[in-house]
Amino acid sequence: MLLDNDAFLSALNKLYQTTSKKGTVWVTMKKYVDSDSNFSRKKAERIKESEEEENKCLVRATNGKKKISTIVLAKDKSMFEKNYKNVLLINLDNLKVEKKKPTPTTTPSSSTTAKTAAKKTKV
Protein backbone atom coordinates (compact mmCIF):
# COMPACT_ATOMS: atom_id res chain seq x y z
CA MET A 1 0.00 0.00 0.00
CA LEU A 2 1.59 3.30 -1.13
CA LEU A 3 1.42 5.99 1.56
CA ASP A 4 2.72 9.52 1.91
CA ASN A 5 5.86 9.98 4.03
CA ASP A 6 4.21 10.91 7.35
CA ALA A 7 1.58 8.19 7.10
CA PHE A 8 4.31 5.67 6.23
CA LEU A 9 6.33 6.58 9.32
CA SER A 10 3.32 6.28 11.61
CA ALA A 11 2.38 2.93 10.03
CA LEU A 12 6.00 1.80 10.42
CA ASN A 13 5.87 2.76 14.09
CA LYS A 14 2.74 0.60 14.48
CA LEU A 15 4.45 -2.29 12.69
CA TYR A 16 7.38 -2.12 15.09
CA GLN A 17 5.06 -1.99 18.09
CA THR A 18 3.03 -5.01 16.96
CA THR A 19 6.20 -7.06 16.50
CA SER A 20 7.98 -5.86 19.65
CA LYS A 21 7.43 -9.11 21.57
CA LYS A 22 7.81 -11.52 18.69
CA GLY A 23 8.42 -10.96 15.02
CA THR A 24 10.54 -9.08 12.52
CA VAL A 25 10.14 -5.99 10.38
CA TRP A 26 12.07 -5.75 7.11
CA VAL A 27 12.74 -2.31 5.64
CA THR A 28 14.23 -1.91 2.16
CA MET A 29 15.24 1.18 0.22
CA LYS A 30 16.07 1.45 -3.46
CA LYS A 31 16.20 4.02 -6.23
CA TYR A 32 12.83 4.54 -7.85
CA VAL A 33 12.62 5.28 -11.57
CA ASP A 34 9.22 6.00 -13.12
CA SER A 35 10.27 5.17 -16.68
CA ASP A 36 11.27 1.59 -15.77
CA SER A 37 7.60 0.71 -15.45
CA ASN A 38 7.03 1.21 -19.19
CA PHE A 39 8.95 -1.59 -20.94
CA SER A 40 7.25 -1.14 -24.30
CA ARG A 41 9.56 1.75 -25.18
CA LYS A 42 13.07 1.23 -26.41
CA LYS A 43 15.81 1.20 -23.83
CA ALA A 44 17.46 4.35 -25.23
CA GLU A 45 14.24 6.34 -24.80
CA ARG A 46 13.85 5.16 -21.21
CA ILE A 47 17.44 6.13 -20.36
CA LYS A 48 16.94 9.65 -21.75
CA GLU A 49 13.80 10.15 -19.70
CA SER A 50 15.36 8.75 -16.53
CA GLU A 51 18.23 11.24 -16.75
CA GLU A 52 15.76 14.13 -16.68
CA GLU A 53 13.75 12.84 -13.70
CA GLU A 54 14.26 13.91 -10.11
CA ASN A 55 15.89 11.27 -7.91
CA LYS A 56 13.41 9.32 -5.80
CA CYS A 57 13.77 6.58 -3.22
CA LEU A 58 11.27 3.75 -2.79
CA VAL A 59 11.03 2.67 0.86
CA ARG A 60 9.20 -0.56 1.67
CA ALA A 61 8.45 -2.21 5.00
CA THR A 62 6.79 -5.50 5.84
CA ASN A 63 6.32 -7.82 8.77
CA GLY A 64 5.48 -10.77 6.52
CA LYS A 65 1.74 -10.07 6.57
CA LYS A 66 1.29 -6.34 6.08
CA LYS A 67 3.20 -4.37 3.43
CA ILE A 68 3.61 -0.60 3.31
CA SER A 69 5.65 1.64 1.02
CA THR A 70 6.36 5.26 0.20
CA ILE A 71 8.29 7.28 -2.35
CA VAL A 72 10.68 9.87 -0.93
CA LEU A 73 11.63 12.79 -3.17
CA ALA A 74 15.16 14.21 -3.10
CA LYS A 75 13.95 17.49 -1.60
CA ASP A 76 12.22 15.65 1.29
CA LYS A 77 15.12 13.29 2.00
CA SER A 78 16.64 15.06 5.00
CA MET A 79 13.32 15.49 6.82
CA PHE A 80 12.34 11.88 6.13
CA GLU A 81 15.71 10.63 7.42
CA LYS A 82 15.34 12.58 10.67
CA ASN A 83 11.83 11.25 11.28
CA TYR A 84 12.88 7.71 10.28
CA LYS A 85 15.79 7.88 12.73
CA ASN A 86 13.41 8.90 15.52
CA VAL A 87 11.12 5.94 14.75
CA LEU A 88 14.10 3.59 14.87
CA LEU A 89 15.42 5.02 18.15
CA ILE A 90 12.02 4.63 19.79
CA ASN A 91 11.42 1.06 18.66
CA LEU A 92 14.83 -0.60 18.51
CA ASP A 93 15.49 -0.66 22.24
CA ASN A 94 15.28 -4.43 22.69
CA LEU A 95 18.01 -5.57 20.31
CA LYS A 96 19.90 -8.66 21.40
CA VAL A 97 23.66 -8.52 21.76
CA GLU A 98 25.16 -11.70 20.39
CA LYS A 99 27.78 -13.31 22.57
CA LYS A 100 31.01 -14.28 20.91
CA LYS A 101 31.88 -17.94 21.02
CA PRO A 102 34.92 -18.60 23.19
CA THR A 103 38.00 -19.67 21.31
CA PRO A 104 39.56 -23.00 22.26
CA THR A 105 42.38 -22.63 24.78
CA THR A 106 44.30 -25.71 23.67
CA THR A 107 47.24 -25.04 21.42
CA PRO A 108 48.33 -27.43 18.68
CA SER A 109 51.64 -28.12 20.41
CA SER A 110 49.95 -29.34 23.63
CA SER A 111 47.71 -31.72 21.69
CA THR A 112 50.70 -33.21 19.85
CA THR A 113 52.57 -33.78 23.12
CA ALA A 114 49.54 -35.63 24.46
CA LYS A 115 49.55 -37.87 21.38
CA THR A 116 53.25 -38.64 21.68
CA ALA A 117 52.83 -39.42 25.38
CA ALA A 118 50.04 -41.85 24.51
CA LYS A 119 52.25 -43.56 21.92
CA LYS A 120 55.10 -43.99 24.42
CA THR A 121 52.85 -45.72 26.92
CA LYS A 122 51.65 -48.22 24.32
CA VAL A 123 55.16 -49.36 23.42
Curated annotation (Swiss-Prot):
Region described as Disordered: 99-123
Compositional bias ranges of the Low complexity kind: 103-116
Entry superkingdom: Eukaryota
One BP term from GO: protein targeting to ER
Subcellular localization, as worded in the UniProt entry: Cytoplasm
Keywords: Cytoplasm, Ribonucleoprotein, RNA-binding, Signal recognition particle
GO molecular function: 7S RNA binding; endoplasmic reticulum signal peptide binding
Keyword Cell inner membrane belongs to the record: no
Subunit-structure text: Heterodimer with srp9; binds RNA as heterodimer. Component of a signal recognition particle (SRP) complex that consists of a 7SL RNA molecule and six protein subunits: srp72, srp68, srp54, srp19, srp14 and srp9.
Its biological purpose: Component of the signal recognition particle (SRP) complex, a ribonucleoprotein complex that mediates the cotranslational targeting of secretory and membrane proteins to the endoplasmic reticulum (ER). Srp9 together with srp14 and the Alu portion of the SRP RNA, constitutes the elongation arrest domain of SRP. The complex of srp9 and srp14 is required for SRP RNA binding.
Family indicated by similarity: Belongs to the SRP14 family.
PANTHER family: SIGNAL RECOGNITION PARTICLE 14 KD PROTEIN
Listed name of the protein: Signal recognition particle 14 kDa protein
Organism: Dictyostelium discoideum (Social amoeba)
